Curated annotation (Swiss-Prot):
The gene is GPD2. Belongs to the NAD-dependent glycerol-3-phosphate dehydrogenase family. Disruption phenotype: Leads to poor growth under anaerobic conditions. Does not produce detectable glycerol, is highly osmosensitive and fails to grow under anoxic conditions, when GPD1 is also deleted. This is Glycerol-3-phosphate dehydrogenase [NAD(+)] 2, mitochondrial. Keywords: Cytoplasm, Mitochondrion, NAD, Oxidoreductase, Phosphoprotein, Transit peptide. Present with 8966 molecules/cell in log phase SD medium.
Length: 440
């Protein structure tokens, strides 16, 4: 009878407390009085936690994927101004995905943001229809993000200046080589109080040397600009598969105050979704550098994948690449923080994701298998989109050459030589090998 009672008690406890009472844990089962006291404390603790945090399933989540979110962040934002109006500049694969995320949040937090989100579209014909009209009637970007339903409060606009009219927050999400032309058109039409976030990956080379794209926006438009970057393949985010990202933003000197201006809490509400978790930090330089240079490393991973060299070679490329990313940041942007590269989604996590798939790996793999050039591969594979590593490796080479430091970054230089000077991919190991043997 004793054995039966113990088994029954174990079975009951396993069902009610499966984590605490495994068969191994049952060997040190607490007494009945201890168990009751512990259960009472757990119940009281749970009641206190639920009193402070209202957790509910989000309406966009599928029933079989019950991601939950906390509304506690909303309660601490008390707006002392009109709701923020948001415009997304760019409507490609990633631009449309971010616009979807933002539009879901502006509708959800309509006391913080104006629900309608404008998305500037470089208009083009899809058959006999304009892409803008298709987005606004069918609520899908059939060219760059097909089969993904977009919120009805997301409005496509082919007129750049009209799309930003009255906007308080601009989100740049275009191929970075087009940024100078876009900024030139915006000059004189953006008020000083406007804030911006750059989702672009790359650098601007000019009279000021190598420059972060967020800094370029600030200098050219006179507005504060942060950055967003992370381990985010657009199709997965668009399908609401769980992922995380990093937003970096520094409060400007003309910050208007809590509840009157964009800050970390506002940005969290703008970008955070149940399927898209956001961490907001100050290190704009760190996440921008990592976001740009990971695409160069991804090209190298694509080369070795296309040659069939396997996972060991890819891992070696990623190790060397991470080292050169950190070195580049410390050398040219000393304000960047080393911990950003390994603590944030925008760092090593983004590097791993990008080197495992995405446009740059796809293009480089195709180059290795077919012998075609980078631009030919990009044109044939990407449906009008860009592999940013192709341009970034040239920008990095030009800057390092100006500084006479190309030998300090052998992986970046090797990628440039393969892409632009037709150096044999098979020579990659010799080009990046670190020799510690002294000549005698």
């Amino acid at each position: 009878m004793l054995a039966v009672r113990r088994l029954t008690r174990y079975t009951f406890l396993k069902r009610t407390h499966p984590v605490l009472y495994t068969r191994r844990a049952y060997k040190i089962l607490p007494s009945r009085s201890t168990f009751l006291r512990r259960s009472l404390l757990q119940t009281q603790l749970h009641s206190k936690m639920t009193a402070h945090t209202n957790i509910k399933q989000h309406k966009h989540c599928h029933e079989d994927h019950p991601i939950r979110r906390s509304d506690s962040a909303v309660s601490i934002v008390h707006l002392k101004r009109a709701p923020f109006k948001v415009t997304v500049i760019g409507s490609g694969n990633w631009g449309t995905t971010i616009a979807k995320v933002i539009a879901e949040n502006t509708e959800l937090h309509s006391h913080i943001f104006e629900p309608e989100v404008r998305m500037w579209v470089f208009d083009e014909k899809i058959g006999d229809e304009n892409l803008t009209d298709i987005i606004n009637t069918r609520h899908q970007n059939v060219k760059y993000l097909p089969n993904i339903d977009l919120p009805h409060n997301l409005v496509a606009d082919p007129d750049l200046l009209h799309s930003i009219k009255g906007a308080d927050i601009l989100v740049f999400n275009i191929p970075h080589q087009f940024l100078p032309n876009i900024v030139k058109q915006l000059q004189g039409h953006v008020a000083p109080h406007v804030r911006a976030i750059s989702c672009l990956k790359g650098f601007e080379l000019g009279s000021k040397g190598v420059q972060l794209l967020s800094s370029y926006v600030t200098d050219e438009l006179g507005i504060q600009c942060g950055a967003l970057s992370g381990a985010n393949l657009a199709p997965e985010v668009a399908k609401e598969h769980w992922s995380e990202t990093t937003v970096a933003y520094q409060l400007p000197k003309d910050y208007q105050g809590d509840g009157k201006d964009v800050d970390h809490k506002i940005l969290k509400l703008l970008f955070h979704r149940p399927y898209f978790h956001v961490n907001v930090i100050d290190d704009v330089a760190g996440i921008s550098i990592a976001g740009a240079l990971k695409n160069v490393v991804a090209l190298a991973c694509g080369f070795v994948e296309g040659m069939g060299w396997g996972n060991n070679a890819s891992a070696a490329i990623q190790r060397l690449g991470l080292g050169e990313i950190i070195k580049f940041g410390r050398m040219f942007f000393p304000e960047s923080k080393v911990e950003t590269y390994y603590q944030e989604s925008a760092g090593v996590a983004d590097l791993i994701t990008t080197c495992s798939g995405g446009r740059n790996v796809k293009v480089a793999t195709y180059m290795a298998k077919t012998g075609k050039s980078a631009l030919e591969a990009e044109k044939e594979l990407l449906n009008g989109q860009s592999a940013q590593g192709i341009i970034t490796c040239r920008e990095v080479h030009e800057w390092l050459q100006t500084c006479e430091l190309t030998q300090e970054f052998p992986l970046f230089e090797a990628v440039y030589q393969i892409v632009y000077n037709n150096v044999r991919m098979e020579d990659l190991p010799e080009m990046i090998e670190e020799l510690d043997i002294d000549d005698e």
